[in-house]
UniProtKB/Swiss-Prot annotation:
InterPro entries: Ribosomal_bL35, Ribosomal_bL35-like, Ribosomal_bL35_CS, Ribosomal_bL35_sf. Coiled coil: none annotated. One of its GO terms (biological process) is translation. Belongs to the bacterial ribosomal protein bL35 family. The keyword Lipoprotein does not apply. GO terms for cellular component: cytosolic large ribosomal subunit. This is Large ribosomal subunit protein bL35.
Amino acid sequence: MPKNKSHSGASRRFRVTGTGKIMRRRTNKNHLLEHKPSKRTRRLSVDVRVSPADARKIRKLLG
């Protein structure tokens, strides 16, 4: 049986750390940043962990 392909959209959006946690970027950090406070853009630049409820599904997509 051939290997399953990983979901290309999910592989761009999520990454697995060395300890197995799945990390994602925060929203609202792509464009129209001029009027957003610097404090907010700094806060949004930190990656966050995916919730455990979604982690199982994402792990399946990543293969």
